[in-house]
Regions:
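Short, glycine-rich, amphipathic interfacial segments at transmembrane boundaries or analogous
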Residues: 218-219, 286-326, 386-405
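C-terminal terminal-structure detector
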Residues: 375-452
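N-terminal hydrophobic signal-anchor/signal peptide
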Residues: 1-24, 125-267, 437-438, 442-452
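Membrane-cytosol interface motif
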Residues: 81-85, 137-152, 283-306
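A short, structured surface patch at a secondary-structure boundary
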Residues: 320-383, 422-430
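A hydrophobic, helix-centered structural microdomain
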Residues: 247-310, 347, 416, 422-452
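Loop-to-transmembrane-helix entry motif
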Residues: 81-85, 89, 253-261, 337
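Signature of alpha-helical transmembrane segments in polytopic membrane proteins
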Residues: 1-132, 452
Length: 452
Protein backbone atom coordinates (compact mmCIF):
# COMPACT_ATOMS: atom_id res chain seq x y z
CA UNK A 1 0.00 0.00 0.00
CA UNK A 2 1.39 3.40 -1.04
CA UNK A 3 1.77 6.27 1.42
CA UNK A 4 -0.94 8.16 -0.49
CA UNK A 5 -3.43 5.29 -0.08
CA UNK A 6 -2.42 4.93 3.56
CA UNK A 7 -3.07 8.63 4.23
CA UNK A 8 -6.40 8.63 2.35
CA UNK A 9 -7.70 5.64 4.33
CA UNK A 10 -6.72 7.23 7.64
CA UNK A 11 -8.43 10.50 6.70
CA UNK A 12 -11.64 8.67 5.76
CA UNK A 13 -11.72 6.88 9.13
CA UNK A 14 -11.12 10.19 10.95
CA UNK A 15 -13.93 11.87 8.99
CA UNK A 16 -16.26 9.02 10.00
CA UNK A 17 -15.32 9.70 13.63
CA UNK A 18 -15.93 13.42 13.19
CA UNK A 19 -19.41 12.74 11.82
CA UNK A 20 -20.25 10.20 14.55
CA UNK A 21 -19.26 12.55 17.39
CA UNK A 22 -21.02 15.52 15.77
CA UNK A 23 -24.37 13.73 15.32
CA UNK A 24 -25.39 13.79 19.04
CA UNK A 25 -24.61 17.51 19.26
CA UNK A 26 -26.45 18.20 16.00
CA UNK A 27 -29.57 16.44 17.31
CA UNK A 28 -29.31 18.25 20.64
CA UNK A 29 -29.00 21.61 18.87
CA UNK A 30 -31.73 20.96 16.32
CA UNK A 31 -34.27 19.52 18.75
CA UNK A 32 -33.73 21.82 21.74
CA UNK A 33 -31.05 24.51 21.92
CA UNK A 34 -31.84 26.13 18.55
CA UNK A 35 -35.22 27.13 20.04
CA UNK A 36 -33.61 28.72 23.13
CA UNK A 37 -31.46 31.37 21.45
CA UNK A 38 -32.61 34.98 21.31
CA UNK A 39 -32.43 35.23 17.51
CA UNK A 40 -33.89 32.33 15.55
CA UNK A 41 -31.47 30.54 13.28
CA UNK A 42 -32.31 29.48 9.74
CA UNK A 43 -30.92 26.36 8.12
CA UNK A 44 -27.64 28.17 7.35
CA UNK A 45 -27.25 29.18 10.99
CA UNK A 46 -27.94 25.63 12.13
CA UNK A 47 -25.30 24.25 9.80
CA UNK A 48 -22.89 26.96 11.00
CA UNK A 49 -23.31 25.81 14.64
CA UNK A 50 -22.86 22.18 13.68
CA UNK A 51 -19.82 23.08 11.59
CA UNK A 52 -18.39 25.07 14.50
CA UNK A 53 -18.71 22.01 16.72
CA UNK A 54 -16.94 19.83 14.15
CA UNK A 55 -14.06 22.30 13.74
CA UNK A 56 -13.56 22.75 17.50
CA UNK A 57 -13.72 18.99 18.11
CA UNK A 58 -11.14 18.41 15.38
CA UNK A 59 -8.74 21.00 16.84
CA UNK A 60 -9.11 19.77 20.42
CA UNK A 61 -8.91 16.19 19.20
CA UNK A 62 -5.47 16.91 17.76
CA UNK A 63 -4.35 18.16 21.19
CA UNK A 64 -5.80 15.17 23.07
CA UNK A 65 -4.61 12.52 20.56
CA UNK A 66 -8.25 11.66 19.84
CA UNK A 67 -7.47 10.41 16.32
CA UNK A 68 -4.28 8.51 17.16
CA UNK A 69 -5.51 5.02 16.30
CA UNK A 70 -2.14 3.38 16.96
CA UNK A 71 -2.26 4.16 20.70
CA UNK A 72 -1.35 1.11 22.78
CA UNK A 73 -4.56 1.14 24.81
CA UNK A 74 -8.09 1.55 23.48
CA UNK A 75 -9.08 3.15 26.80
CA UNK A 76 -6.62 6.00 26.17
CA UNK A 77 -8.09 6.57 22.70
CA UNK A 78 -11.63 6.64 24.12
CA UNK A 79 -10.49 8.99 26.89
CA UNK A 80 -9.04 11.44 24.37
CA UNK A 81 -12.22 11.29 22.27
CA UNK A 82 -14.56 11.90 25.21
CA UNK A 83 -12.37 14.67 26.65
CA UNK A 84 -12.29 16.52 23.30
CA UNK A 85 -16.06 16.10 22.87
CA UNK A 86 -16.85 17.31 26.39
CA UNK A 87 -14.55 20.32 26.04
CA UNK A 88 -16.21 21.23 22.75
CA UNK A 89 -19.67 20.77 24.24
CA UNK A 90 -18.70 23.00 27.16
CA UNK A 91 -17.45 25.79 24.89
CA UNK A 92 -20.58 25.69 22.74
CA UNK A 93 -22.84 25.55 25.80
CA UNK A 94 -21.32 28.88 26.91
CA UNK A 95 -21.87 30.27 23.40
CA UNK A 96 -25.50 29.10 23.44
CA UNK A 97 -26.12 30.64 26.87
CA UNK A 98 -24.70 33.95 25.63
CA UNK A 99 -26.97 33.83 22.59
CA UNK A 100 -29.97 32.89 24.76
CA UNK A 101 -29.04 35.57 27.34
CA UNK A 102 -29.68 33.12 30.18
CA UNK A 103 -28.55 29.78 31.55
CA UNK A 104 -30.02 26.97 29.48
CA UNK A 105 -31.10 23.53 30.64
CA UNK A 106 -28.11 21.21 30.92
CA UNK A 107 -30.01 17.94 30.49
CA UNK A 108 -30.07 17.96 26.66
CA UNK A 109 -26.34 18.64 26.69
CA UNK A 110 -25.74 15.77 29.11
CA UNK A 111 -27.77 13.52 26.82
CA UNK A 112 -25.57 14.61 23.90
CA UNK A 113 -22.43 13.78 25.91
CA UNK A 114 -23.84 10.33 26.71
CA UNK A 115 -24.42 9.77 23.00
CA UNK A 116 -20.90 10.93 22.23
CA UNK A 117 -19.44 8.52 24.79
CA UNK A 118 -21.25 5.66 23.03
CA UNK A 119 -20.10 6.87 19.60
CA UNK A 120 -16.51 7.38 20.80
CA UNK A 121 -16.36 3.91 22.34
CA UNK A 122 -17.78 2.29 19.20
CA UNK A 123 -15.45 4.18 16.85
CA UNK A 124 -12.33 3.71 19.01
CA UNK A 125 -12.79 -0.05 19.29
CA UNK A 126 -13.47 -0.49 15.58
CA UNK A 127 -10.77 1.95 14.42
CA UNK A 128 -8.10 0.52 16.75
CA UNK A 129 -8.82 -3.04 15.62
CA UNK A 130 -9.01 -1.99 11.94
CA UNK A 131 -5.75 -0.05 12.11
CA UNK A 132 -3.63 -2.96 13.33
CA UNK A 133 -5.33 -5.37 10.94
CA UNK A 134 -4.82 -3.18 7.86
CA UNK A 135 -1.49 -1.69 8.94
CA UNK A 136 0.45 -4.41 10.79
CA UNK A 137 3.59 -3.35 12.70
CA UNK A 138 6.40 -2.40 10.33
CA UNK A 139 9.60 -4.48 10.23
CA UNK A 140 12.02 -2.37 12.22
CA UNK A 141 15.67 -2.29 13.24
CA UNK A 142 17.13 -0.50 16.26
CA UNK A 143 20.70 0.79 15.93
CA UNK A 144 22.40 1.68 19.22
CA UNK A 145 25.78 2.72 20.59
CA UNK A 146 25.42 1.76 24.26
CA UNK A 147 23.04 -1.02 25.21
CA UNK A 148 22.05 0.68 28.50
CA UNK A 149 18.40 1.71 28.28
CA UNK A 150 17.78 -0.27 25.10
CA UNK A 151 15.43 -2.80 26.71
CA UNK A 152 13.47 0.04 28.31
CA UNK A 153 13.06 1.68 24.88
CA UNK A 154 11.85 -1.53 23.25
CA UNK A 155 9.67 -2.92 26.03
CA UNK A 156 8.71 -0.34 28.68
CA UNK A 157 8.28 2.57 26.25
CA UNK A 158 6.16 0.40 23.94
CA UNK A 159 8.32 0.34 20.80
CA UNK A 160 7.77 -3.40 20.36
CA UNK A 161 3.98 -2.93 20.51
CA UNK A 162 3.87 -0.52 17.56
CA UNK A 163 6.78 -1.84 15.52
CA UNK A 164 7.95 -5.34 14.62
CA UNK A 165 11.51 -5.15 15.94
CA UNK A 166 13.39 -7.63 13.75
CA UNK A 167 16.89 -6.82 14.96
CA UNK A 168 18.97 -4.69 17.29
CA UNK A 169 22.35 -3.71 15.86
CA UNK A 170 25.38 -2.17 17.49
CA UNK A 171 26.48 0.86 15.45
CA UNK A 172 29.81 -0.76 14.49
CA UNK A 173 28.04 -3.89 13.30
CA UNK A 174 25.63 -1.76 11.27
CA UNK A 175 28.37 0.37 9.67
CA UNK A 176 30.32 -2.73 8.68
CA UNK A 177 27.34 -3.97 6.66
CA UNK A 178 24.64 -1.38 5.96
CA UNK A 179 22.79 -3.91 3.81
CA UNK A 180 21.58 -5.48 7.06
CA UNK A 181 18.98 -2.69 7.08
CA UNK A 182 17.57 -3.73 3.71
CA UNK A 183 13.98 -4.89 4.00
CA UNK A 184 13.31 -2.72 7.03
CA UNK A 185 10.57 -0.10 6.78
CA UNK A 186 11.74 1.81 9.85
CA UNK A 187 15.01 2.27 11.70
CA UNK A 188 15.39 3.74 15.19
CA UNK A 189 18.78 5.27 16.00
CA UNK A 190 19.59 5.64 19.70
CA UNK A 191 22.66 7.24 21.27
CA UNK A 192 24.75 7.17 18.08
CA UNK A 193 27.28 9.97 17.51
CA UNK A 194 26.63 12.37 14.65
CA UNK A 195 29.31 11.11 12.24
CA UNK A 196 28.19 7.47 12.35
CA UNK A 197 24.55 8.52 12.45
CA UNK A 198 24.89 10.60 9.28
CA UNK A 199 26.24 7.60 7.37
CA UNK A 200 23.26 5.50 8.45
CA UNK A 201 20.83 8.36 7.73
CA UNK A 202 22.09 8.82 4.17
CA UNK A 203 21.83 5.10 3.46
CA UNK A 204 18.31 4.78 4.88
CA UNK A 205 17.00 7.86 3.05
CA UNK A 206 18.47 6.52 -0.19
CA UNK A 207 16.71 3.19 0.39
CA UNK A 208 13.37 4.81 1.29
CA UNK A 209 13.55 3.66 4.92
CA UNK A 210 11.90 5.82 7.59
CA UNK A 211 14.38 6.92 10.25
CA UNK A 212 13.52 7.90 13.83
CA UNK A 213 16.39 9.51 15.73
CA UNK A 214 16.30 9.52 19.52
CA UNK A 215 18.22 12.75 20.06
CA UNK A 216 21.03 13.70 22.35
CA UNK A 217 20.98 17.07 24.12
CA UNK A 218 23.11 18.64 21.40
CA UNK A 219 20.61 17.54 18.75
CA UNK A 220 17.75 19.15 20.66
CA UNK A 221 19.68 22.42 20.95
CA UNK A 222 20.44 22.32 17.21
CA UNK A 223 16.74 21.84 16.44
CA UNK A 224 16.17 25.45 17.48
CA UNK A 225 18.91 26.79 15.22
CA UNK A 226 18.15 29.80 13.04
CA UNK A 227 18.96 29.14 9.35
CA UNK A 228 20.78 32.00 7.63
CA UNK A 229 23.31 32.79 4.90
CA UNK A 230 26.82 34.12 5.56
CA UNK A 231 29.81 34.33 3.24
CA UNK A 232 27.69 32.74 0.48
CA UNK A 233 27.25 29.69 2.71
CA UNK A 234 24.24 28.21 4.53
CA UNK A 235 24.76 28.70 8.27
CA UNK A 236 22.83 27.57 11.35
CA UNK A 237 22.96 30.06 14.22
CA UNK A 238 22.63 28.57 17.71
CA UNK A 239 22.47 30.71 20.82
CA UNK A 240 21.04 31.05 24.29
CA UNK A 241 17.26 31.13 24.73
CA UNK A 242 16.23 34.61 23.66
CA UNK A 243 12.46 34.91 23.27
CA UNK A 244 11.22 38.14 21.71
CA UNK A 245 9.97 40.94 24.01
CA UNK A 246 6.54 40.65 22.38
CA UNK A 247 6.39 36.93 23.19
CA UNK A 248 7.41 37.49 26.81
CA UNK A 249 4.91 40.34 27.23
CA UNK A 250 1.97 38.32 25.88
CA UNK A 251 3.06 35.23 27.85
CA UNK A 252 3.16 37.24 31.09
CA UNK A 253 -0.23 38.81 30.33
CA UNK A 254 -1.68 35.33 29.77
CA UNK A 255 -0.18 34.16 33.07
CA UNK A 256 -1.81 37.02 34.99
CA UNK A 257 -5.24 36.72 33.35
CA UNK A 258 -5.48 32.92 33.49
CA UNK A 259 -4.20 32.64 37.08
CA UNK A 260 -6.62 35.36 38.27
CA UNK A 261 -9.60 33.72 36.55
CA UNK A 262 -8.58 30.30 37.87
CA UNK A 263 -8.22 31.61 41.43
CA UNK A 264 -11.72 33.13 41.32
CA UNK A 265 -13.37 30.06 39.80
CA UNK A 266 -11.52 27.57 42.00
CA UNK A 267 -11.77 29.57 45.24
CA UNK A 268 -14.38 27.17 46.76
CA UNK A 269 -12.12 24.19 45.96
CA UNK A 270 -9.17 26.15 47.35
CA UNK A 271 -11.00 26.77 50.65
CA UNK A 272 -12.31 23.21 51.06
CA UNK A 273 -8.86 21.73 50.34
CA UNK A 274 -7.18 24.07 52.84
CA UNK A 275 -9.67 23.06 55.56
CA UNK A 276 -9.22 19.35 54.78
CA UNK A 277 -5.41 19.58 54.93
CA UNK A 278 -5.54 21.64 58.13
CA UNK A 279 -7.80 19.06 59.80
CA UNK A 280 -5.16 16.42 59.11
CA UNK A 281 -2.83 18.14 61.58
CA UNK A 282 -0.26 20.79 60.81
CA UNK A 283 -0.33 23.81 58.50
CA UNK A 284 -2.42 23.87 55.32
CA UNK A 285 0.38 25.19 53.13
CA UNK A 286 3.90 24.02 52.51
CA UNK A 287 6.74 26.21 51.24
CA UNK A 288 9.84 24.89 49.54
CA UNK A 289 12.80 26.57 47.84
CA UNK A 290 12.93 25.94 44.09
CA UNK A 291 14.98 27.20 41.13
CA UNK A 292 13.66 29.24 38.23
CA UNK A 293 15.14 31.31 35.38
CA UNK A 294 18.91 31.95 35.63
CA UNK A 295 19.09 29.91 38.84
CA UNK A 296 17.06 32.38 40.90
CA UNK A 297 15.57 30.87 44.05
CA UNK A 298 11.97 31.33 45.17
CA UNK A 299 9.57 29.69 47.61
CA UNK A 300 7.02 27.53 45.85
CA UNK A 301 3.64 27.24 47.57
CA UNK A 302 1.70 23.97 47.80
CA UNK A 303 -0.99 22.39 49.89
CA UNK A 304 0.82 20.15 52.35
CA UNK A 305 0.41 16.50 51.40
CA UNK A 306 3.08 14.95 53.66
CA UNK A 307 3.72 14.75 57.37
CA UNK A 308 5.21 17.88 58.92
CA UNK A 309 8.44 15.97 59.74
CA UNK A 310 8.68 14.27 56.32
CA UNK A 311 12.33 15.32 55.87
CA UNK A 312 13.44 15.62 59.48
CA UNK A 313 16.75 13.91 58.61
CA UNK A 314 17.56 16.80 56.25
CA UNK A 315 17.78 14.59 53.14
CA UNK A 316 15.86 15.82 50.08
CA UNK A 317 13.85 12.98 48.55
CA UNK A 318 11.43 12.69 45.67
CA UNK A 319 8.14 10.98 46.38
CA UNK A 320 7.89 7.24 45.68
CA UNK A 321 4.19 7.54 44.88
CA UNK A 322 1.41 5.63 46.63
CA UNK A 323 3.96 3.58 48.61
CA UNK A 324 5.46 6.68 50.24
CA UNK A 325 4.49 6.45 53.94
CA UNK A 326 5.22 10.17 54.41
CA UNK A 327 2.05 11.10 52.50
CA UNK A 328 -1.03 11.73 54.66
CA UNK A 329 -4.51 10.35 53.97
CA UNK A 330 -5.70 13.72 52.68
CA UNK A 331 -2.41 14.04 50.83
CA UNK A 332 -3.12 10.92 48.77
CA UNK A 333 -6.43 12.40 47.64
CA UNK A 334 -5.19 15.88 46.76
CA UNK A 335 -2.14 14.46 44.96
CA UNK A 336 -4.33 12.16 42.87
CA UNK A 337 -6.44 15.17 41.83
CA UNK A 338 -3.42 17.53 41.57
CA UNK A 339 -5.08 19.83 44.10
CA UNK A 340 -1.80 20.15 45.99
CA UNK A 341 -0.52 22.28 43.10
CA UNK A 342 -3.33 24.87 43.27
CA UNK A 343 -1.50 27.42 45.49
CA UNK A 344 1.11 27.78 42.75
CA UNK A 345 -1.41 30.02 40.99
CA UNK A 346 -0.28 32.61 43.57
CA UNK A 347 3.34 32.05 42.51
CA UNK A 348 2.27 32.65 38.90
CA UNK A 349 0.45 35.84 39.83
CA UNK A 350 3.52 37.04 41.73
CA UNK A 351 5.78 36.30 38.76
CA UNK A 352 7.89 33.51 40.27
CA UNK A 353 6.39 30.96 37.88
CA UNK A 354 4.82 30.90 34.45
CA UNK A 355 1.89 28.64 33.57
CA UNK A 356 4.04 26.77 31.05
CA UNK A 357 7.75 26.11 31.48
CA UNK A 358 10.20 23.54 32.87
CA UNK A 359 9.11 22.37 36.32
CA UNK A 360 11.22 23.98 39.07
CA UNK A 361 13.64 21.67 40.87
CA UNK A 362 14.94 21.90 44.42
CA UNK A 363 18.50 23.34 44.50
CA UNK A 364 19.98 20.28 46.22
CA UNK A 365 18.35 17.83 43.80
CA UNK A 366 19.29 19.98 40.79
CA UNK A 367 22.88 19.97 42.04
CA UNK A 368 22.86 16.15 42.11
CA UNK A 369 21.57 16.07 38.54
CA UNK A 370 24.20 18.59 37.39
CA UNK A 371 26.99 16.44 38.84
CA UNK A 372 25.92 13.59 36.56
CA UNK A 373 24.99 15.72 33.53
CA UNK A 374 26.15 19.37 33.57
CA UNK A 375 23.80 20.19 30.67
CA UNK A 376 20.90 19.88 33.14
CA UNK A 377 21.52 23.55 34.01
CA UNK A 378 20.45 24.53 30.47
CA UNK A 379 16.81 24.18 31.48
CA UNK A 380 17.26 27.27 33.68
CA UNK A 381 17.33 29.46 30.56
CA UNK A 382 13.55 29.88 30.77
CA UNK A 383 11.20 30.70 33.65
CA UNK A 384 9.91 27.62 35.48
CA UNK A 385 6.28 26.65 35.01
CA UNK A 386 3.26 25.04 36.65
CA UNK A 387 3.07 22.58 33.77
CA UNK A 388 5.44 21.84 30.94
CA UNK A 389 6.36 19.77 27.92
CA UNK A 390 7.91 17.04 30.06
CA UNK A 391 4.82 16.82 32.29
CA UNK A 392 2.46 16.46 29.32
CA UNK A 393 4.49 14.06 27.19
CA UNK A 394 6.41 12.21 29.87
CA UNK A 395 5.63 10.69 33.25
CA UNK A 396 6.48 11.70 36.80
CA UNK A 397 9.22 9.04 36.81
CA UNK A 398 10.58 9.70 33.32
CA UNK A 399 14.38 9.78 33.59
CA UNK A 400 16.01 13.17 34.23
CA UNK A 401 17.86 12.99 30.91
CA UNK A 402 14.64 12.42 28.96
CA UNK A 403 12.89 15.20 30.90
CA UNK A 404 15.81 17.50 30.15
CA UNK A 405 15.52 16.82 26.43
CA UNK A 406 11.78 17.50 26.52
CA UNK A 407 12.29 20.77 28.39
CA UNK A 408 15.00 21.83 25.95
CA UNK A 409 12.73 21.04 23.01
CA UNK A 410 10.22 23.47 24.51
CA UNK A 411 12.90 26.10 25.16
CA UNK A 412 14.29 25.74 21.62
CA UNK A 413 10.93 26.62 20.05
CA UNK A 414 9.15 29.31 22.12
CA UNK A 415 5.58 29.64 20.87
CA UNK A 416 2.31 30.89 22.32
CA UNK A 417 0.48 28.22 20.29
CA UNK A 418 2.65 25.55 21.90
CA UNK A 419 1.90 27.06 25.33
CA UNK A 420 -1.84 26.84 24.65
CA UNK A 421 -1.51 23.24 23.46
CA UNK A 422 0.38 22.29 26.63
CA UNK A 423 -2.24 24.02 28.82
CA UNK A 424 -5.04 22.10 27.10
CA UNK A 425 -3.11 18.82 27.10
CA UNK A 426 -2.48 19.21 30.85
CA UNK A 427 -6.21 18.64 31.42
CA UNK A 428 -5.81 15.19 29.85
CA UNK A 429 -3.05 14.03 32.21
CA UNK A 430 -4.86 15.21 35.37
CA UNK A 431 -6.81 11.96 35.54
CA UNK A 432 -4.16 9.59 34.20
CA UNK A 433 -2.72 7.64 37.17
CA UNK A 434 0.60 6.82 35.48
CA UNK A 435 1.42 10.52 35.34
CA UNK A 436 1.45 10.68 39.16
CA UNK A 437 3.82 7.77 39.70
CA UNK A 438 6.87 8.41 41.82
CA UNK A 439 10.41 7.10 41.77
CA UNK A 440 11.29 3.58 42.85
CA UNK A 441 11.12 2.80 46.54
CA UNK A 442 14.44 3.51 48.19
CA UNK A 443 15.55 6.05 45.59
CA UNK A 444 16.02 9.59 46.79
CA UNK A 445 16.17 11.12 43.31
CA UNK A 446 15.01 10.25 39.84
CA UNK A 447 18.68 9.78 38.91
CA UNK A 448 18.76 6.74 41.19
CA UNK A 449 15.49 5.59 39.64
CA UNK A 450 17.25 5.42 36.27
CA UNK A 451 19.81 2.94 37.58
CA UNK A 452 17.34 0.68 39.42
Amino acid sequence: MSKFQHDVMLKIVKIIDLVMITIPFALCWELYYSYQVYAKFGWKGNWAMIGLFAVLFFLLGKVYDSFWMSLQRISELIYGQVLAAMATDGILYIVICLMARRLCNLLPGIAAIAGQVVMATLWARCAHSWYFRIFPPQPTAVVYDVRHGLEKLINEYGLSKKYDVKMTLNVEECLNDLSLLDGMQSVFISGVHSHERNIILKYCVGQGINVFVIPRVGDVIMSGAQPMHMFHLPVLRVGRYMASPEFLFVKRAMDIVISLVALVILSPVFLITAIAVKSDGGPAFYKQVRLTEDGKQFEILKFRSMRVDAEKDGVARLSTGDKDDRITKVGHIIRACRLDELPQLLNILKGDLSIVGPRPERPEIAAQYCEEMPEFALRLQAKAGLTGYAQVYGKYNTTPYDKLQMDLMYIAHPSLIEDLKIMLATVKILFMPESTEGVAEGATTAMEQETK
